[in-house]
A protein has these predicted regions:
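Non-catalytic accessory segments flanking enzyme active sites
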Residues: 1-40, 68
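Active-site glycine-rich loops that stabilize anionic/oxyanionic intermediates
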Residues: 22, 42, 49-54
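Hydrophobic core residues within well-ordered beta-strands of beta-rich domains
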Residues: 24, 42-44, 79
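Flexible, active-site-proximal loop/turn residues at the rims of small-molecule/cofactor binding pockets
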Residues: 35, 51-52, 149
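Short coil/turn segments at beta-strand junctions that form active-site/ligand-binding loops
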Residues: 40-42, 116-117
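Active-site-proximal cap/loop segments of hydrolase catalytic domains
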Residues: 47, 57-173
């Protein structure tokens, strides 16, 4: 039907559940290669941005234009984990850490994740949180941070594009 996609090893997706470090029930999406074998160990990329599990039935066209395209990664033998984050006001980095690490550990415990090959990726707000996470745990062997606010001191006086409001309001809440 679509010969241009004949060589794509399509992904399947599973809704997964775990608890955060402080016991809050969480969920996320786990994309697996079409030829997934639970007896084998796979490298895994963790990509997050607030709440992504609502995209359970979203179609991902194979494309290099996304930060992390689950179809492209799964077609190349990777697992892709999109965990939801439970935020505590004033602690965005710690909230992401306490949501993501237990989720990754729960998947590693299932036996098919190569714990020596887990990477994390984040863009913008997710990039900031990824930068925070990699300073707090040795769990991730690689990280991709796209357009993160990695220096809040220099960004403090910046202006938000959408609202025209100073960034200080984000950091002072």
């Amino acid at each position: 039907l679509n010969p241009q996609q004949a060589q794509v090893n399509w992904a399947s997706v599973e809704l997964v559940r775990w608890r955060s470090a402080d016991g809050v029930p969480l969920q996320g999406l786990l994309y697996k290669p079409e030829d997934f074998d639970p007896a084998r160990k796979y490298p895994m990329v963790v990509y997050f941005y607030e709440q992504l599990s609502d995209n359970l039935h979203q179609y991902h066209t194979p494309s290099g234009r996304n930060v992390v395209n689950p179809t492209v990664y799964a077609s190349n033998g990777y697992l892709v984990f999109l965990p939801n984050i439970h935020y505590q006001t004033g602690f965005p980095g710690e909230s992401a850490l306490e949501s993501i690490v237990p989720g990754v550990q729960a998947l590693v415990a299932r036996g098919f994740v190569d714990e020596r090959a887990v990477g994390i990726a984040g863009q913008s707000w997710g990039g900031y949180q990824s930068a925070y996470i990699i300073t707090r745990t040795p769990l991730f062997r690689a990280a991709f941070l796209g357009a993160p606010v990695a220096n809040m001191t220099s960004a403090y006086g910046g202006i938000r594009w959408e609202s025209g409001v100073a960034r200080a309001f984000q950091y002072e809440k």
